[in-house]
């Protein structure tokens, strides 16, 4: 009887070991390098939308912006907490994909004051992080982002992003807050 119990226990452990050996290991933790790559990708995409607008017009820029939003933001996960720089009440916050798209490329009568932030002739985007906080499958960054337009004029904003790694391992922006730096003048 004792031999049978030991044999059954050993067999169970062997089967369990085999099952664990074949189980894929997935690391959902976000690294600093992934955050930096996502920020660079966001800036490059903004420039690409701006260039597309200049070369091919608003409909082409809108089509590209839709792809960028679908690839970079977490609207597929739920509402994104997006507070763009140049919005005002009652449309300050853009928790839907349609609201974000309108902010970037305009043309949506629901958001009549949107002129398309991504259509401003941006040629360079530079991110300077004050800090990046990493916590498993989420990461938060805060710092300044400077945008250089086709005339060389630089606009700098304070920016906070929160990224979440989705089930496919892609970083998604789930919080995006942007504001002009405070000036006492």
Segments and roles (model prediction):
Residues 46, 145-147, 177:
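Short beta-strand segments enriched in hydrophobic/aromatic residues
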Residues 1-21:
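Gram-negative bacterial Sec-dependent N-terminal signal peptides
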Residues 55-129:
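A solvent-exposed, acidic/Ser-Thr-rich amphipathic alpha-helical stretch
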Residues 22-33, 106-112, 120-123, 185:
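Mature soluble domains of exported/periplasmic/lumenal proteins and thiol-rich metal-chelating peptides
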Residues 20-72:
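Short, low-complexity N-terminal intrinsically disordered segments enriched in polar/charged residues
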Residues 134-142, 151-184:
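Short beta-strand edge/turn micro-motifs at domain boundaries
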Residues 111-150, 157-159:
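Acidic, glycine-rich flexible loop segments
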């Amino acid at each position: 009887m004792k031999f049978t119990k030991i044999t059954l226990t050993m067999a169970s452990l062997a089967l369990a070991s085999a099952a664990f050996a074949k189980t894929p290991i997935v690391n959902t933790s976000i690294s600093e390098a992934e955050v930096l790559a996502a920020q660079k990708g966001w800036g490059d995409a903004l420039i690409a939308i701006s260039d597309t607008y200049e070369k091919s017009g608003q409909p082409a820029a809108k089509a590209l912006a839709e792809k960028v939003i679908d690839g970079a933001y977490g609207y597929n996960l739920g509402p994104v907490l997006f507070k763009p720089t140049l919005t005002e009440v009652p449309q300050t916050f853009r928790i839907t994909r349609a609201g974000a798209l309108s902010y970037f490329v305009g043309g949506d009568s629901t958001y009549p004051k949107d002129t398309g932030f991504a259509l401003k002739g941006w040629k360079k985007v530079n991110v300077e992080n004050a800090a990046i906080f990493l916590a498993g499958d989420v990461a938060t960054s805060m710092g300044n982002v400077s945008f250089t337009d086709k005339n060389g004029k630089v606009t700098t904003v304070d920016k906070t992003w929160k990224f979440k790694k989705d089930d496919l391992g892609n970083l998604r922006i789930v919080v995006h807050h942007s504001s002009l730096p405070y000036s006492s003048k």
